[in-house]
Amino acid sequence: MKRLLFVSLLTIPGLFLNAAQASTYQEQVYLARDRVLPALVHIQPVVEDYRTGELKKQAVVGSGVIFHPDGYVVTNYHVAGKAKRIYCTLSDREQLPADYIGGDPSTDVAVLKLRLEGYHGTIHVAELGDSDSIQVGQQVLAMGSPLALARSVSAGVISTKDRYFSDEYRLPSGEKTGRFNLWIQTDAAINFGNSGGPLVDLNGRVIGINSRATFMANNLGFAIPINVVKQATQAILKDGHVTRSWIGVTAQALQEMENYFGTDRNRGVLIASLDPGSPAAEAGLAAGDVILEIDGRPVSARFVEELPAFYNAIASRPPGTAISLKVQRGDQERVVNLETRPLGQLQGEDYECSEWGLTVRDITRQMQIANQLRDSTGVFVTGVKRLGPADLGGLNQGDVIQLVDRAPMDNLDAFKTRYEALRSAGTKKIMLTVRRAGATRIAIINLEQRGEEQPHE
């Protein structure tokens, strides 16, 4: 009995220690909650969707956090980037309209401004931390409106602070994101509606903006590091967008290729592909070349996690900057000089042709490259309404309309002018010349023809 009593007494101090630690942790959670939750915003944008061949407006839900006393809110581009009307509910449950200031699909960041006229409450501002100082295993809180449940808080840890995703990841609007940044991975619960909300450390500082969740697995959420967000918001507040330089290079991690290319460990960036007509292609670079230096500074992307730093080394320069690249091809090294160009918009403006039953988009250079189009003339068909005139005329999503009744369509403005003129004139039959998979074909829009749904058997 004495021995059993002795063992039991030895365990008591441990119990008290655990209780004290739990109390301290709980207090830290409360502190972090109280510092950030008042700045949390429940966002209800009304977005426009053109993908079905007609303009549809729908209400969605997201989150955001106030980062400036004038009422500026940071959220995700995929939450508010396509919004025409935005309403924000603050922590005191007051709802205010907000204006879209600008966004950056490449990092999935957007900025809103609350309309504070007539609002007599207090604007609480969250403190933005330093994502470069975070640690794997660090305790964090995720705040937002999961499944539209506003003012929600979940807890977890930082699982990884430098997760990389290829730039082929696309936002719901179709734009690519992820090339220029790494992601914070957390096991704190993140669901639909959490997007745009803050990831918070236990000191009550925002270290990331929640952006992505993996719904095929539990406890896998991802946030944009707050230092990336800071850079994006500064540019958006100044210009409404983020300006980047571009040379048209897609890079690949070099680790598995070092023996073949004969490069030193941690030296060089492998060119996997080049965009046609890009500065790099015009300067004579080729897939398989290894970039060793930019303006005399060594560069390396041995691992995929190092690729964003390489892209940013170019993108962060003003467009029109002359740069010098030291390049290795085979066993030879040479210097290539070129000039950067603006990256430009990832996607063009959308437009609905309601009478024809289709939606189109202006073609940007990045769209031309992504869709392997011959050039950027014409308009890109983003949607065809089922059994509408365009559908019955044989148009498909992804077609490029080059001519309308033999008139060339250089861009969306030319198309709008032609469409409105034909509509005003009451023209019922229109001939379209379209490009599909590199081939040209004719499609006829017949406004006197109407399709009918066939009954299901």
State the predicted function of each range.
Residues 20-283, 287, 293-321, 329-333, ...:
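Serine-dependent protease modules
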Residues 7-16:
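Bacterial N-terminal signal peptides
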Residues 1-4:
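Positively charged n-region of N-terminal signal peptides that target proteins for export
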Residues 320-322, 427-429:
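Extracellular Ig-like/FN3 beta-sandwich strand-entry sites
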